[in-house]
A protein has these predicted regions:
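Central beta-strand plus flanking loop segment that forms part of the substrate or channel wall
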Residues: 67, 180-215, 245-249
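Glycine-rich FAD pyrophosphate-binding loop
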Residues: 29-57
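N-terminal FAD cofactor-binding segment of flavoenzymes
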Residues: 54-96
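Short FAD-binding loop at a beta-strand-to-alpha-helix junction that anchors the flavin cofactor
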Residues: 294-312
């Protein structure tokens, strides 16, 4: 429920009420309902006033793996989201201008879908409504945590909304406020960063032909190009595009008029879904790898982009964050049963030990994929050809790759 001012003390304070922070709060509240944990979510932006029935051609979207769907189902979020999600029934992986195409289908995997694409506004409204209605979660917005200082068995927090400040004690502070978390900087938590010298051009398009639940990962000379299926909008065959290009080319492409940019995109993607009939407003953001050197401290844990920001090439950022979130909920749940404070290091250390292999594999896989498919050197071109061919020739290898893509194979 929305509160006008926070109480003096909470078991858990979550900085950030976005997709990761809100989902964590809802999942934790459901899993530990009997424990009666006091949870506070602090969100800098006011709840959206967007009409839930209003549609937009340009709505941003997120790809959720099959494993993420299961996590959201356990949190009773999926029951509200399922009728707004577009299923991915087939993934087509190709290298522009070279032989070798790999296809992964839900039929091969005996599943109804490999994953789902949801519009951020739909998921955001569901999460916001759940936070607003929840009796076990205090939702303080718009507000920010201005200062965080360790104390014995917890944290002292200074939370501001407008000209008012509130002092709050918390056993555990969860930082889920994005890759530019000011509290991380204030606490001196350092991030290792790697610049890929690429920008992502993100937009929605309408194709001549229906996508039929197909998602495409196309590796081009400009960089990886992902095309994801979206729900139709006014009888338009919509897809979401994430096109990774080098920094210099991104400036060039964004200066083009819409017709010229559409031609460039059509040339890179080809005619798999016919011609592109409409191009939405493009947005651009820099791509890199960022990993926090400390994900836990006594009474502090990092989740989502504040812990690790990945390249979108494999679509694993949000999915990894949800698996981290699920593991943290389980560790806190076990700790409480053992009589531990939820911010104790043994609780947080157990979480990190359980998730470290998953994180390492996803980060390494994504980083290697970027380097392999963003290079036109002959050795890497041959490696790509062999890789795509091997996925088709060896069913066991394809099944293993599919499990990773569906978010059910990481971490052993």
């Amino acid at each position: 429920m929305i509160v006008k001012s926070p109480e003096n003390s909470y078991d858990i304070v979550i900085a950030g009420g976005g997709m990761v922070g809100a989902t964590f709060a809802i999942s934790l509240s459901k899993a530990l309902k009997k424990a009666g944990l006091k949870i506070l979510v602090v969100e800098a932006f006011e709840p959206s006033t967007v009409d839930p029935n209003a549609a937009s051609f340009d709505s941003r979207s997120t790809a959720l793996s099959f494993g993420s769907k299961e996590i959201l189902n356990d949190s009773s979020i999926w029951v509200e989201l399922s009728n707004k999600a577009e299923p991915i029934r087939e993934i087509v992986i190709s290298d522009k201008g070279r032989f070798g195409t790999a296809r992964i289908t839900c039929k091969e995997q005996n599943l109804e879908a490999l994953g789902y694409v949801v519009e951020n506004k739909d998921l955001g409204l569901i999460l916001n409504n759940r936070l607003t209605r929840s009796e076990s979660i205090h939702y303080f917005t718009p507000a920010t945590i201005r200062d965080a200082a360790p104390r014995k068995s917890g944290m002292n927090l200074k939370i501001s909304n407008g000209s008012d400040s509130h002092l709050v004690r918390s056993n555990l502070l969860v930082l889920a406020d994005g890759g530019k978390s000011p509290i991380c900087d204030q606490l001196g938590i350092v991030r290792a960063r790697q610049n890929y010298n690429q920008h992502a051009i993100v937009c929605n398009v309408a194709f001549e032909k229906a996508h039929r639940g197909m998602a495409f990962e196309r590796f081009t000379e400009t960089g990886p190009l992902a095309v994801l299926p979206l729900r139709n909008f006014k009888n338009e065959n919509r897809c979401s595009v994430v096109w990774s290009v080098n920094e210099q080319e991104s400036d060039k492409f964004l200066k083009l008029n819409q017709e010229a940019l559409l031609r460039e995109l059509q040339g890179q993607f080809g005619q798999r879904l016919g011609r592109i009939k409409k191009l939405g407003e493009p947005h651009c953001f820099p791509l890199g790898l960022s990993i926090a050197k400390e994900q836990i401290r006594p009474s502090i844990v990092l989740l989502g982009n504040v812990a690790h920001t990945l390249h979108p090439v494999a679509g694993q950022g949000m999915n990894l964050a949800l698996r981290d979130m699920e593991a943290l909920v389980k560790s806190i749940e076990k700790g409480i049963k053992e009589g531990s404070n939820c911010g104790e290091m043994r609780v947080l250390q157990r979480y990190l030990e359980n998730q470290s292999a998953d994180q390492h594999q996803v980060i390494t896989f994504t980083d290697n994929l970027v380097k392999l498919f963003s290079s036109n050197s002959m050795s890497k071109v041959m490696t790509r050809k062999l890789g795509l061919l091997s996925l088709e020739l060896f069913p066991g290898l394809k099944k293993s790759f599919a499990k990773q893509a569906m978010g059910i194979g990481w971490g052993g």
